[in-house]
UniProtKB/Swiss-Prot annotation, chains A, B, C, D:
Residue sites binding FMN per the record: 123-125, 239-240, 284, 299-303, 325
Cofactor note: Reduced FMN (FMNH(2)).
Family stated for the protein in its record: Belongs to the chorismate synthase family.
GO molecular function: chorismate synthase activity; FMN binding
Protein name per UniProt: Chorismate synthase
GO biological process: amino acid biosynthetic process; aromatic amino acid family biosynthetic process; chorismate biosynthetic process
Named cofactor requirement(s): FMNH2
GO cellular component, one term: cytosol
The protein's assembly and partners: Homotetramer.
Gene3D superfamilies, per the entry: Chorismate synthase AroC
EC nos: 4.2.3.5
Listed pathway(s): Metabolic intermediate biosynthesis; chorismate biosynthesis; chorismate from D-erythrose 4-phosphate and phosphoenolpyruvate: step 7/7
Keywords: Amino-acid biosynthesis, Aromatic amino acid biosynthesis, FAD, Flavoprotein, FMN, Lyase, NADP
Length: 354, 354, 354, 354
């Protein structure tokens, strides 16, 4: 399905080689000043070809708002927006018309849809994320007014891992390198790895860490409305994701309960807080007021510039050589998408309560 | 919220110390023979006190169906069912009336609900899973008829890890030990660890692995209806979960793309299959026909039989001693819950297509 | 489907000849005092056999709450409730096992469900309304605290019509007669008509009028979330309904626009109000603060104590004689159901805003 | 809210004086040939200024598809479409910036939205129906392939009423006059009435009748998923509607049950059919296979070219004179909208079953 959210809802449309990508945001509160520069800036962050690490596609996507805004503010009606598709090299994909690319969605799509658009991955392509980032930017603007800040960064590429806690990391460094890792030493190593992988025509995966700061207590519902489940659903809807964990996550299994509890105490201001935050800001599915932090694992992207053996629709084996422009590592580009999905999810739950 | 699913929908109700736990299943196809023994058997699997590993609560929950069934078959109308609450020791919890148990949902619930039921964790308690297991059992019955089999087992407890691929594991061993690990050697080590942790009044977490075999190709939708996102949402809705990954998951980050692609070929029967299954049976959010396998991480349970420092509603520090009956490790009991959530999710997507 | 509402949600279950009828209410705010007498009283109002007009079924339905309530107040968790089925004469229906009753749902159900429960109409029976009335009673309690009052009454039976505006009617008279018409003269005529129809073994239909007083301005959304559409959907979900209109409705067609506009003016208290209320309290799909009033048309009930020619499942013509206990006119019994559906709808929209 | 449907879903956006009107259709099956001429033709039918009866606004709306279509067929992905707004006279509305037009949505909108777009009624304007008609056209194309035909016509204007049953009416006459009434004699009278009303600067309402032919048995669900409830919800979502009834509707109250039952018999082909169709093709909320027929009542449009007394935002009384271009009767233009809503509803339920 193509709609995300319950109250703040994004319905997206558009194939990467169709006429336009776009979306409709329903449930956006009225009276929000729309900072167009900020929205366009977020969209620019996701573009490939913005650094030496990524491909040269150099898409300059300008978002156009068609409704829902009057005199610079939202009016509470659905916000329709589009980004025209240009600069898409359809011919790069012509050799792929009848071929199933390994680990791509082609085979599953063919089985499902029969008549489908083979060009550029149709709706499984990363260009579909444009709509997410536009809606996410608007969500961020609204959350910022409530003192809620969403920050994501690359914390692992292949075997290169930033193992420090987010508390010890300087967020202002994130945008200083193309790889969006806030530890400049580790960032260098990551860049070197990506370059070498690229030269070999291979790809590499990694992990993005995200922190949601200032989320008030009480968002989420026990049982089936857990905020942790909603965040995992949001992250796992991003292309190329393979895993999600929050708080101590998969690594926390090595701790005993006595080593992993967040003990309550009353602080200097008389407020009830916890000494630690192993839970990652969510207890029993409901936000606790502490920082929410989680990780998203991304697989190595499946388009290789190496040759690969595969089959076409009739089952004949063929050697696949893909020309064109592809990424050795999607992690840096995925950072704004993770932030967008987090912003939309948090806002959706926020509006449910307030 | 308290409803799970889009077509095969479970709405659950009931607090652990209220009158009854129950649910309503809507969207169950008509004409399914309801194997009552099987359903009751699944419910028995989740019971504590069934082995030396778990607590002595010894709840014998008998499910009672109130509607939706006629002459032993489903009739397509909503299936209402209840399990009466007995054998709940309310007095065990009386010392907790005004106290926030560390890493429990108490504090977040108090902030959210004001007037809430402190006894036994209300709806955040594991007893709420009764409804999930009943609905999951019915879902399994329906899937079995379509040749779809769901199997889960404990693959990690603390540092003890069953690292073999599921392909090399013998499922018939799962129920042979209390810890539900199919490798009997590893199972022994797990049991020893749990016993020692229990004696110290501490708790330990772990990982459950789940395989969905025989899922046809085409379930799921790209963008926001990905089957991977739905499964993660379902698993993360279970109490005490901290993470989800599928296919090569978090561990796959160490592979390059060239080492992680599932290459297509035509097999002896002329069918198009893959040589490997790093994707875990889901490509681009849609099932590929291969086995779907995923992991769910559980944190160490938060109720300790050790004393702990905490605060009460007025912020006064108090020493918490919890009497009663608690689990050092919830993993074995969570296995039928993971299977239930998987069955309901797969069935929901199955009914969407067929 | 078996769920009604978006925020205040009722999921109902139960066949009239099954074990129990019941429901789960999700989204009920916490802290509401549950006036059990009031709820049981509303349920008693819908019972047949409470007057000389209706049949002698004499069902005494006692509602039992299973969850969601602690120390007499709602706790914000789902409220599960049941009413056990007794006093249902299954044998009255044995002659109907393979026969399609004219204008009943039998034929359509058979075509749809294959294996279905023929006894007493299964889920198409009026007993399914028990769940609606319980949830409606709770909704009324919540609305009353906000100064919102829902009142319905019978305004037409066959050709006997109460044509006065609701403004000129005395609501305290509604419960004074079995027919629930607030004009005692007209009520007498209605009763006489129903008696004569009953003696002939025939049935008659009518109209119920409903007023929602004190609904604040702003409930509803333009386009697809119109409060008028929601109310019509709610009313048309009641068995035997054939039509809905509000404000001047179908009769207003005879007016010109100049005769039908509600002109604004500022009243003595300085508040902006309208001189008239042809719109029926809803403008552009949003409540205006004025009384919402609407009508629901009910067809004559389809079970006749006269013989009727029909066919069985094999298409053979047979003469249908129905024994048992049936109503010549369902209008009086439908009054609490109309109020319940109105209360649930208004509350659902109220909670969306506040 | 701005989304209609459960499976075949339309999300619409756009204010009449904004940049564009548009929508996204999700859930459209793949492989449907999109007859662009037919879609544009349906859109042309709703335009004002196409006859001497309506206003001279002369909007020529051309729909543009942005996604979801490849080589002329739908591909199963969301279909995004827009219609650019031009030819909207903003200045006609400048006198209205702070004034509440009687029986318009202005007052309720102001109360609800604070900051809203006063020009042309924003989203409460009839231009929003563009999206409905585009989606409805596509729905009709799909239904036609299944042998399902939707036909609507004007059956009443003011006191002029076409009282014949739809069975005796010649549908080929509908488009022969501007008023879209299939009885040419009655049509003349209706046109005369509308002209005279227009000269007086007044407005008049009426009724549209709609027939859905060829709907298979089994669409709809008892309880809350009744097809009759869904149709009423769809119709009542149209601007200016005041009532809905189907089958014998409000007029059927005058019949006794014995005079209103549809008796079953086996016809020459051995098929089980009914002798009559008082039920209007829906029994117990489920389609019976017979023609579904219903009526929708429209109030006289609220914009008058006569002066009217009203208040502005500060409560000061002012005399309202509206310049511009307005309709004395919206009924003819509403015919394609009624058909669109019926088509979308029937298709939604059809896809649920098949």
């Amino acid at each position: 399905m193509n709609t995300f959210g319950n109250i703040f809802k994004l319905t997206s449309f558009g194939e990467s080689h169709g006429t336009a990508i776009g979306g409709v945001i329903d449930g956006c509160p009225a009276g929000i000043v729309l900072d167009m520069e900020f929205v366009q800036g977020e969209l620019d962050k996701r573009r490939p070809g913005q650094s030496e690490l990524t491909t040269s596609r150099n898409e300059s996507d300008k978002v156009e708002f068609l409704s829902g805004i009057y005199e610079g503010k939202t009016i509470g009606t659905p916000i329709g927006f589009i980004v025209w598709n240009n600069n898409q090299h359809s011919s790069d994909y012509d050799s792929l018309k009848n071929v199933f690319r390994p680990s791509h969605a082609d085979y599953t799509y063919f089985q499902k849809y029969r008549h489908y658009d083979h060009r550029g991955g149709g709706r499984s392509s990363a260009r579909e994320t444009i709509a997410r980032v536009v809606a996410g930017a608007i969500a961020k603007l609204i959350l910022q007014k409530k003192g809620i800040k969403i920050t994501a960064y690359v914390s692992q590429v292949g075997d290169i891992c930033l193992s420090k806690s987010y508390i010890q990391v300087d967020f202002s460094n994130i945008e200083k390198t193309a790889v969006r890792c806030p530890d400049l030493e580790i960032a260098k190593q990551m860049i070197a790895l990506i370059q070498s992988v690229r030269l070999r025509g291979d790809t590499v995966g990694g992990v993005i860490t995200c922190i949601c700061h200032g989320v008030p207590v009480g968002l989420g519902n026990p049982v089936f409305g857990k905020l942790s489940a909603a965040l995992s659903n949001a992250m796992m809807s991003i292309n190329a994701t393979k895993g999600f964990d929050y708080g101590m996550g998969f690594n926390g299994i090595h701790r005993k309960g006595s080593e992993a509890n967040d003990l309550y105490y009353r602080n200097k201001d008389g407020k009830i807080v916890t000494k630690s935050n192993y839970s990652g800001g969510i207890q029993g599915g409901i936000s606790s007021g502490e920082d929410i932090y989680f990780r998203v694992a991304f697989k190595p992207v499946a388009t290789l510039l190496q040759g690969q053996l595969t089959v076409d629709k009739d089952g004949n084996e063929i050697q696949l050589e893909v020309k064109g422009r592809h990424d050795p590592c999607v992690l840096p580009r995925a950072v704004p998408i993770v932030e967008s999905m987090a912003a939309m999810t948090i806002l959706d739950y926020y509006l449910y309560n307030y």
